[in-house]
Amino acid sequence: MGSLSPWHWAILAVVVIVLFGAKKLPDAARSLGKSMRIFKSEMREMQSETKAEPSAIETNTANPTPVQSQRIDPAAATGQDQTEARPA
């Protein structure tokens, strides 16, 4: 009961052929193959990019730029009193 016997696989294959038709199965397999090739090439490209990026990341984080904080008063920036800016 744990695994499928050869008869189960044969019945499953017949059902798939009946449902999808003999003509559509090669097209579907071809499309699946193309999709897998594209997926694998994209994965290889991503892996090569991640191998190249760590050196660039390490050099950028070695020299952080200091940031000066400033407090800006909204009333002084607009030139209005805070009571005038409130809705009536």
From Swiss-Prot:
Domain of life of the source: Bacteria
An example of a Pfam family matching this protein is: TatA_B_E
**InterPro entries documented for this protein:** TatA/B/E, TatA/E
Protein's GO biological process: protein transport by the Tat complex
Keyword annotations for this protein, in alphabetical order, are: Cell membrane, Membrane, Protein transport, Translocation, Transmembrane, Transmembrane helix, Transport
The annotated topology with respect to the bilayer is:
Single-pass membrane protein
Q: Where is the composition biased (Basic and acidic residues)?
A: 43-52
Stretches for region Disordered: 43-88
| NCBIfam families documented for this protein | PRK00575.1, tatAE
- Membership in a protein family: Belongs to the TatA/E family.
Query: What is the protein name for this chain?
Result: Sec-independent protein translocase protein TatA
Ranked from the top, the taxonomy reads: Bacteria, Bacillati, Actinomycetota, Actinomycetes, Mycobacteriales
Point out the gene that encodes the protein.
Answer: tatA
